[in-house]
């Protein structure tokens, strides 16, 4: 049972449709080349073409102070195949993520790191891409993993015996706080994911780990016989779909809100966990949050 790679290829890239924008007007354009951010996870602060056609992408956080996780995701379209030089400008922040590129939203290729040129302070990163005619080229800090992916992935898991898919509540913007449960046992494993939007590698690791727990072998079956699973795969859906660096829609780091519970997302999940454990008289055996450095 390996759903992760399959789920990454679902129809996320309905590029003519925008989750946030009223229109799919380009952010900027030059001689037939257009830049868009009209998709889940798409976000840049601004962009500008020089007369020679060099594209400068401005990247800034949703608010400050903030951890340096400079997310970006945008797509390029061209009327004819065009070579486009690009500069990622982080202002006072430093370059961190080597670009990942995709034509179809299924297969991603990391741009050769050796071909990315950095300025002395590492606040700008330069590289060049070939944009095919009449097709979208997506450029992102990490391969995209958004609400659409999670919905399809969870749908696949719901076919497993005893699995129930539900919700702990809603985010500030009304997105679902997904919950997966298995039949309750004396002990429960709590799994948390995607508190920080750019941490897609941690999200993929979490998905792979969960799929391993549902394998049809002696070890996995023995585990499920003794331990219930309580999974919240995407705690910050607003930040994830908006392409934020770190925070939720109210500018809070949800991974620093376990205790104060000032945010709807952390409050909802804390309450849901407590209710689940109490209702089924189950003890929390372990809590895991898979992220990345």
Task: Locate the predicted segments by residue.
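Short, acidic Gly/Pro/Ser/Thr-rich loop/turn segments
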Residues: 95, 146, 238-239
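Short acidic, glycine/serine/threonine-rich loops at helix termini
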Residues: 99, 151-153, 242-247
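C-terminal accessory segments enriched in acidic
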Residues: 1-8, 20-137, 246, 253-293
């Amino acid at each position: 049972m390996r759903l992760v790679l399959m789920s990454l290829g679902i129809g996320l890239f309905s590029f003519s449709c925008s989750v946030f924008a009223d229109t799919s007007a380009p952010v900027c354009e030059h001689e037939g080349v257009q830049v868009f951010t009209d998709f889940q996870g798409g976000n840049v602060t601004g962009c500008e073409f020089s007369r020679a056609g060099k594209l400068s992408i401005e990247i800034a956080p949703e608010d400050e102070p903030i951890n340096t996780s400079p997310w970006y995701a945008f797509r390029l379209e061209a009327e004819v195949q065009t070579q486009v030089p690009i500069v990622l400008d982080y202002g006072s922040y430093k370059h961190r993520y080597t670009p990942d590129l995709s034509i179809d939203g299924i297969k991603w290729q990391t741009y050769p790191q050796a071909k990315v040129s950095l300025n002395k302070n590492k606040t700008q990163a330069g590289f060049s891409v070939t944009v095919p005619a009449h097709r979208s080229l997506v450029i992102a800090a990490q391969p995209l993993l958004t609400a659409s992916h999670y919905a399809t992935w969870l749908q696949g898991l719901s076919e497993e015996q005893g699995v129930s898919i539900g919700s702990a509540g809603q985010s500030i913007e009304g997105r679902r706080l997904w919950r997966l449960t298995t039949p309750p046992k004396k002990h429960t494993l709590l799994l948390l994911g995607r508190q920080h939007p750019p941490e897609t590698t941690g999200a993929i690791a979490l998905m792979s780990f969960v799929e391993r727990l549902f394998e049809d072998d002696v070890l996995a079956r023995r585990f499920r016989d003794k331990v219930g699973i309580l999974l919240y795969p995407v705690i910050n859906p607003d930040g994830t779909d908006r392409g934020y660096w770190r925070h939720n829609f109210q500018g809070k780091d949800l991974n620093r809100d376990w205790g104060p519970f000032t945010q709807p997302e952390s409050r909802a999940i804390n309450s849901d966990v407590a209710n689940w454990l109490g209702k089924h008289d189950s003890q929390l055996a372990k809590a895991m949050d898979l992220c990345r450095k």
